[in-house]
Amino acid sequence: MFGIGTDIIEIDRIRRAYHTYGDRFLNKIFTKGEQAYCFSKSDPYASLAVRFAAKEAVSKALGTGIGKSLKWKEIEISRGTQHPQVSVPESLLALLEVKRILLSMSHCREYATAVAIAEVTNSSK
């Protein structure tokens, strides 16, 4: 293992951000694919919030946080057949010697949460 990250957010916080900032908020945080998926759901705000939490958790697991090394939209969360899929720049994964990122996401009526684990190729880390 290299790192673990977790995050929890109130779904209403994402709802308020969207109603305040609209597409500007969406386009800063989420890829077009993420937006399309979330707005195809009956509760898009829960889907957006769980992806927001997942991006935070992934950035913490990698040890970079969101900022200069890793931008919001460089992390893409998509639906896999059995579990969520995480895409981040290959160059960053190579630099950190990360071979894969495991992700678990969940939400209820009020909160969304995610846990990410980054596995390294070199067991000495």
Swiss-Prot record:
UniProt-recorded name of the protein: Holo-[acyl-carrier-protein] synthase
UniProt binding sites for Mg(2+): D7, E56
Q: Which family does it belong to?
A: Belongs to the P-Pant transferase superfamily. AcpS family.
Can the keyword Transport be found in this entry's annotation? no
Q: What is its main location?
A: cytoplasm
Q: Name one GO biological process term.
A: fatty acid biosynthetic process
* Database matches in InterPro entries: 4-PPantetheinyl_Trfase_dom, 4-PPantetheinyl_Trfase_dom_sf, ACPS, Ppantetheine-prot_Trfase_dom
**Which gene is this protein's source?**
acpS
Q: What is its EC number?
A: 2.7.8.7
Gene Ontology MF term list = holo-[acyl-carrier-protein] synthase activity; magnesium ion binding
**Species this protein is from:** Chlamydia muridarum (strain MoPn / Nigg)
Give the subcellular location: Cytoplasm
Which taxonomic lineage is given here? Bacteria, Pseudomonadati, Chlamydiota, Chlamydiia, Chlamydiales
Q: What does this protein do?
A: Transfers the 4'-phosphopantetheine moiety from coenzyme A to a Ser of acyl-carrier-protein.
Q: Looking at the UniProt record for this protein, which Gene Ontology cellular component terms does it annotate, in alphabetical order?
A: cytoplasm
